[in-house]
Amino acid sequence: MSDAPIATSSEVTQSPADYDPTKKQKSAEKTARIPIKIVPAEKLKKPDWIRVKAATGNSRFYEIKDILRANNLVTVCEEASCPNIGECFGKGTATFMIMGDKCTRRCPFCDVGHGRPDPLDVNEPGNLARTIAQLKLNYVVITSVDRDDLRDGGAQHYVDCISQTRELSPNTRIEVLVPDFRGRLDRALDILQACPPDVMNHNMETVPRLYKQARPGADYAHSLKLLQDFKRRNPNVPTKSGLMVGLGETDEEILDVMRDMRAHDIDMLTIGQYLAPSNHHLPVTRYVHPDTFKMFEEEAYKMGFTHAAVGAMVRSSYHADQQAHQAGFA
């Protein structure tokens, strides 16, 4: 057992009478009902290497937002409060989040809202396909909330989005960042077999020791199995996964996860610095130095990853097109 500190959240109380499962819960409301051990921690000062590019006045930032709203679409960029939103929207790129904006999980590192999801929007695949065509995107990332309420975890909705996007934009490469389909993995993979993406991504997020705190409802071995089983069914489709640092892990634990990834045939890797969305989320326990990120990158290539995007501001879908291109997949 490692002696590294465990990231914890501040305590918020919520009575059963206050809980409304149909309401989208964010921040304190979302994390209030998770039994997280509370350890007072001083908020760390951000180092100089943590820098975010803001949207500029002549960027496409507001144009992209208007197009998304007009088509009733959601991006994880907005819902998860991604620090790179200004840069990505400014370049006319976005990671689309399908199946609503209410997740059935309550991961306390994530800023996506929790609640009882709405019924699937049958028009969403068409709206998404038309938006991608309108934006003339060469590479898109499609992700989603967890939908534990659906028998297939939302796999058929992914297939509908992929197939309709390919009908209108046959030259567009499609990466999906999927949930874990826990409890329905074989059914989900059977469905995805009908129309697999160009890149299959599922994030491990953190080291196994921290799963109980950071990913309640998820299972480390299951996430590895998802990617390996998909790869066995689709050997020509690259697989990808991502990790955060700063939740209480050690460098050696990160390297161990990377080894597990390669042992499960994962091709591409992303590692970035965790930044707490609010005081009600898991706190940052450390800011990893650029030299350490460089070490992770060098070790990744030694292990045989085809591409490793590693750095403080790296996120799973940040510059995903460039990641795939550099890996030789796009």
From Swiss-Prot:
It is an enzyme of class 2 (transferase). Pfam families: LIAS_N, Radical_SAM. [4Fe-4S] cluster 1 binds at C77, C82, C88, S317. Residues 7-16 have a biased composition (Polar residues). Residues 20-31 have a biased composition (Basic and acidic residues). One of its GO terms (molecular function) is lipoate synthase activity. Its EC number is 2.8.1.8. It catalyses: [[Fe-S] cluster scaffold protein carrying a second [4Fe-4S](2+) cluster] + N(6)-octanoyl-L-lysyl-[protein] + 2 oxidized [2Fe-2S]-[ferredoxin] + 2 S-adenosyl-L-methionine + 4 H(+) = [[Fe-S] cluster scaffold protein] + N(6)-[(R)-dihydrolipoyl]-L-lysyl-[protein] + 4 Fe(3+) + 2 hydrogen sulfide + 2 5'-deoxyadenosine + 2 L-methionine + 2 reduced [2Fe-2S]-[ferredoxin]. NCBIfam families: lipA, PRK05481.1, PRK12928.1. This is Lipoyl synthase.
